[in-house]
Structures are given as structure tokens and as C-alpha cells.
């Protein structure tokens, strides 16, 4: 899913998101433990499933715009948009799923018909150099993540303009961080990919 605003197929998204409190719940980039890796892969899968199965009018990748670019995944929020997320306001205790970069491929977009084809497509969308993420000026470890083969059923008014109930497959790859909740106040997230830099504000409401 590509990022260009209206067309969001096979796109590279540099979405601004994240959270960091006193301690990051993510380890060094290449070597996340199995439990953490499963959680990161699962969070990326949940995020992309939400994007693909949410109607366009309520979708930041569709016609919904910035009003819908803070995605709620249980007790975690993921700022995620085809271009950039200016800010997300969250409750105290909310974790933030940070996507430094993600590329999605699906059968809806004609990117392939098998797990292997879609996975290769998603991996080919990687930037030459992994992104970096910082929170309030401090670097955050970034981990590579990849979804399992996702089985998607499109809603009415979906972002692809296909008939409601259309079924298909999707795989996404990305570089992410899952961090503990931030303290109340305003925090600055900076994601840098190559020469591109995106800044997002995370506003944690007072208890």
C-alpha cells in the first residue's frame, strides 16, 4: 500500500508516532526477544488490518484525513498517515506504537497472489537505511517487524474502491518501536528516513 494521500496502495508510509516514558519497552534493533518480536509483528498486523478494513470516510488513508490518523489498538495508539501525523492526544497510561517506516502489499493492488510474492513486495519497499526515531531528543531503538499473511475483508466505501465484502491477502513490513506510556504533557517524536524527517507531537492529558 503506497502512501500518496488518495491512492494508498502498496505504499511507503513514514508515519509519525510513538511514545516514550521513562523506559522503552523495546530492545535493540536486530535482536528483539521472541515475545517482544511477536508483539511488534502483531501490532503491525493489527494496524494494517485496521487501515485496510476501515471505511474510507473514517480512514486517514482514504477521505477521512487527519481527523482519523491516530489509530487505537487496544491500550495503544499508533499515529499513522500516508504523509505525517501532526499530533495525537492520549490518556495517561496509553502505550504508543511507533512506525518509523512501513510498506504494505496486497492482492487488492495486484502486488501478488501468494504469501511469498506479497512478502517479497513488502520487503522490497524498505528504505536503503532503516529509519531512526527520537523522543524528546533521545534516540529510541527501532526493530524490524513483519506481519503474517493477513486475510482481509473490505468494507463498503473501502480505500480501494472495490465492492464491499471483497476478500484478499496482505503482507506488510516495517521498522517500529513499542514504548511505555509517556508522562503527562507534550512530547516530540522525530522520525528520520534518509533525507526525510517527520515530527509528531504526543499530548498526554493530565490524569
Placement of each model-derived feature along the sequence:
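Solvent-exposed, flexible loop/coil segments flanking beta-strands in beta-rich domains
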Residues: 39-97, 102-103, 206-207
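Edge beta-strands of extracellular beta-sandwich domains
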Residues: 198-203
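Bacterial N-terminal signal peptides
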Residues: 14-24
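Extracellular-facing segments of soluble proteins and assemblies that are Gly/Ser/Thr-biased and enriched
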Residues: 74-164
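C-terminal region of N-terminal signal peptides and the immediate post-cleavage residues
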Residues: 23-37
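Short, solvent-exposed, Trp/other aromatic-anchored flexible loops in extracytoplasmic proteins
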Residues: 169-183
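A glycine-anchored, Pro-Gly-centered beta-turn/N-cap motif
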Residues: 94, 183-186, 190
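Bacterial N-terminal signal peptides that target proteins for export
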Residues: 3-15
Amino acid at each position: 500500500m503506497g502512501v500518496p494521500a488518495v491512492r494508498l496502495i502498496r505504499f511507503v508510509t513514514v508515519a509519525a508516532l510513538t511514545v516514550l516514558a521513562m523506559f522503552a519497552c523495546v530492545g535493540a534493533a536486530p535482536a528483539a526477544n521472541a515475545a517482544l518480536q511477536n508483539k511488534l509483528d502483531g501490532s503491525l498486523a493489527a494496524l494494517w488490518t485496521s487501515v485496510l478494513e476501515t471505511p474510507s470516510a473514517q480512514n486517514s488513508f482514504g477521505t477521512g484525513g487527519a481527523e482519523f490518523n491516530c489509530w487505537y489498538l487496544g491500550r495503544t495508539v499508533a499515529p499513522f498517515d500516508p504523509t505525517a501525523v501532526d499530533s495525537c492526544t492520549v490518556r495517561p497510561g496509553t502505550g504508543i506504537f511507533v512506525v518509523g517506516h512501513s510498506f504494505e502489499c496486497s492482492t487488492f493492488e495486484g502486488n501478488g497472489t501468494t504469501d511469498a510474492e506479497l512478502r517479497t513486495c513488502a520487503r522490497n519497499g524498505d528504505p536503503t537505511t532503516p529509519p531512526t526515531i527520537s523522543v524528546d531528543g533521545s534516540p529510541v531503538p527501532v526493530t524490524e517487524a513483519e506481519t503474517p499473511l493477513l486475510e482481509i475483508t473490505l468494507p463498503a466505501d473501502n480505500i480501494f474502491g472495490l465492492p464491499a465484502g471483497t476478500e484478499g491477502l496482505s503482507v506488510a513490513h516495517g521498522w517500529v518501536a513499542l514504548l511505555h506510556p509517556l508522562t503527562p504533557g507534550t512530547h516530540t517524536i522525530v522520525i528520520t528516513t534518509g533525507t526525510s524527517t517527520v515530527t509528531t507531537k504526543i499530548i498526554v492529558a493530565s490524569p
